Amino acid sequence: MVEEKSGEKLELTTDNLPPLPVVTMRKCTDCEIVIAPGVAAVKLMIEGCSNTTVSLDGKVLTETLEVWGCNSCTVKVSSPIKTVQVDACQGLALQYERASDFDRCLSAGAFQVSLTFADSLALNGTVDLAELRAQMPGKGFSAETDQFITRHVDGALLTELIIRLSNDFPTTEREVPAQSHGSVRNGPSRVPHCKEALSLLARRALIVCTPLSLSGLRICVQDADAKGQA
C-alpha cells in the first residue's frame, strides 16, 4: 500500500512489491506513481487521492480498477483494464492508450470524469452527473444511489442508468426488451421479470457522446420515450 504520500515520485516494481499484490494508493496528494512493467497485480485501487497521477505500465490480472473519493487525479492505462469502478470522484481523467483495453465504467457520484483513447479519439467522452442532472432535471439523479454504466456502443461512448429487475438482476432500459426475447444471457428465464420491469420503470436515460471536433464533444441526450417515437 502507498499511503499518505505528498509531492513524491514513486515507482512500484517487482523488487519492492510482493508477488501478486493488491496495489492500493490511499490519501496521496501531488504524487506521481508508476506501476512498472513486469508487475502483475491482482487488483488496483485508488482511494482519497488528490492531484495525483498513476501510470499503469504493468498488468492487473483481474483487469479491474477501483477509484473512489478522488479529486483531480489521472490514471494512465497501458494494459487491459476492462472494468473501472468510479465512486464519488471529481475531475478524474482515465487515459487509455488503446480503446480495446476498455470495456465498461461503472460510476456513482462521478463529476467531470473523462475517458480518452489515444488510438480512437472519436470514442472519447465524459461522465458527469452534473450534466445529466441539468439535461434531465425531472429524473432526480442521486449521487449516492444511482449507478451508471458507460460503454462503447455503435461507435460512440454511451452512458446509461443501471436499473434492477424484481430479482435484482442489473440491466439497462435499452437491454430489457432484448432480454424479454431471450436474446441475452439468461434471457428466457427472466421474461416475467423483464415485463414487470418495463411497467415499473420510472427513469429513462440514454446519453450518447459524439465528437464535435478534436477539441470538444457534443452531448446528444434523448429520453427513451422520445427515441421510441422517432
Where are the regions a protein language model picked out?
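Intrinsically disordered, low-complexity terminal regions
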Residues: 1-14, 83-230
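Eukaryotic beta-rich interaction modules
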Residues: 3-18, 26-28, 35-38
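The right-handed parallel beta-helix/beta-solenoid scaffold, focusing on the short coil/turn
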Residues: 8-10, 21-23, 29-31, 42-44, ...
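Feature marks extracellular polysaccharide-active and adherence modules
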Residues: 26, 34-38, 47, 55-57, ...
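Short, polar loop motifs at secondary-structure junctions
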Residues: 60
